[in-house]
């Protein structure tokens, strides 16, 4: 199993819990870029190759195929 290219679940949670109004412009940009890359990596990885944590993260944050 590999989580290569995936955003850490803790980072995802922190990003979602912090309102954009409390983030700097570079932080907002970083979140958008890393969220997009994580979503693409999740869609490119088969369910059999995902760890339990990534499967749960995809289900919670809507990044599953």
From Swiss-Prot:
Biased composition (Basic and acidic residues): 1-17
Induction: By temperature-induced mass conversion from opaque to white colonies. WH11 is abruptly activated at the second cell doubling.
KW Zinc-finger (keyword) present: no
Assigned keywords, A-Z: Stress response
InterPro entries for the chain: HSP9_HSP12 (IPR007250)
Residue segments, region Disordered: 1-32
Polar residues composition bias: residue spans: 18-27
Coiled coil: none
Domain of life per record: Eukaryota
One family name in Pfam for this protein: HSP9_HSP12
Family the entry assigns: To yeast HSP12/GLP1 and S.pombe hsp9.
Protein name (record): White colony protein WHS11
Organism: Candida albicans (strain WO-1)
UniProt gene name: WHS11
